[in-house]
Amino acid sequence: MTKLLHHNEKTSLNGGREPLFSQKELLVLAVPLLVEQLLEVTVGMADTMMVSRCGEAAISGVSLVDMINNLIIVLFAALATGGAVVVSQYLGAKDRQDADKSAGQLLLLSGLSGMVIGAVCFVLARPMIRLFYGSIESDVLDAGVKYLQIIALSYPFLALYNGGAALFRSIGNSKISMQISFLMNIINIVGNAVCIFGFKMGVDGVAWPSVVSRVVAAALILRKCYREDAVLTVPKTLRLDGGMAKRILGIGIPSAFENSLFEAGRILVVSMISTFGTVQIAANAVANNLDGMGVIPGKAISLAMITVVGRCIGAGDHEQTVYYTRKLLLWAYITMGLSNGAILLFLRQLVGIYALSGETMELAITLVTIHAGCAIIFWPLSFVLPNALRAANDVKFTMVVSILSMACWRLGFSYLLCVRMGWGAVGVWVAMVIDWTCRVTCFVLRFRSGAWKTKYQA
């Protein structure tokens, strides 16, 4: 599939220039990100498995809120992406002073956004859930409101952690965020087990350990950022710098708008599924968990893509940009083929881990089969390649494509197949594949055109 990107570009580096990244440096960057993504998805699966013991109303309530939670997380991730791109570009241009300044601005913006969003979600938890999902069963609604209000308390700390982790990725040191993520997830899993099985806390038992783990993670990442021997020197006194903040937000806001509308679209299609009852909601939740495993390598490599391409763009080297983009895409195809192949091979056993009824289990198997089979072909070019464009400041194009593809293809076909034709969750997942096809076409053509080369200005 990476041959699609080949258009008047050579696949190796010429001219005697020294490569910006060695094979070892790419692995040192990508492998910890892979482990971190694996930990994140594993904890999500553990949360779902544990709360499933509290009944299908509880798992449905938590899964519905997790869609809102994902919407919030992508806002923080988009801001972190903006900061990581800017820092990487300054490092590529060997401008250490502005790299330090942009690092401080990222942490400041992350903390402020986390506090505002956390307060809004805590106060408006019930109206938000009603707005997104309409008429859902009362016990599912109550479980969702309780979960959202507790988890909202962690948003400021999650935003700070994401910002700090992005800084370490931008300097090629993803090992730090991996280590902290490991500790955060251990706290989460142990806390869940104690609270759910020991204290019988139900939904509360899933939420509170997440809050504690994120507080600890934020404290540790900030401590690392302010160490005297750190590669980046983050200013100890942070004041808003309009010019630098604008540069970060110039990438972060389009990415946030794009990703938040994408997640909002996912929430809308889940609201369509929710009209078919608890069986469909629960099957969709479990399928999302398992499919998260399949895209772990792709997500890790997409994060690495930001650092690598950002550094190449900052150095003004378009040849190396193309070279490393194709190289990382090849890695994504190989690793996602292995991960999704394994899921398909052991699918029934994996779904059997969850406490599901027979009907729910069979539906979950069908949904995972659709996702895993198609992700091997479409996912890398749909979601890894656009990060190369973002790192080159071509954020408006990726935003427009993502929004239009979501609105026209995923939402449009979800309504047609899920609601009008009565396919339920299966219709939504088929519409997802149609959406991916559109993204692949647009992003490949954009990269081949070379239009992204004109977007970055030092």
PLM regions and their residue ranges:
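Transmembrane helical elements of multi-pass membrane transporters/channels
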Residues: 28-47, 150, 184, 213-217, ...
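Residue-level hotspots within the lipid-embedded alpha helices of multi-pass solute transporters
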Residues: 37-38, 74, 114, 118, ...
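Helix-terminus/linker motif at the lipid-water interface of multi-pass membrane proteins
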Residues: 38-60, 129-138, 194-201, 260-293, ...
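Small-residue hotspots at the loop-to-helix junctions and early N-terminal turns
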Residues: 56-67, 144, 148, 207, ...
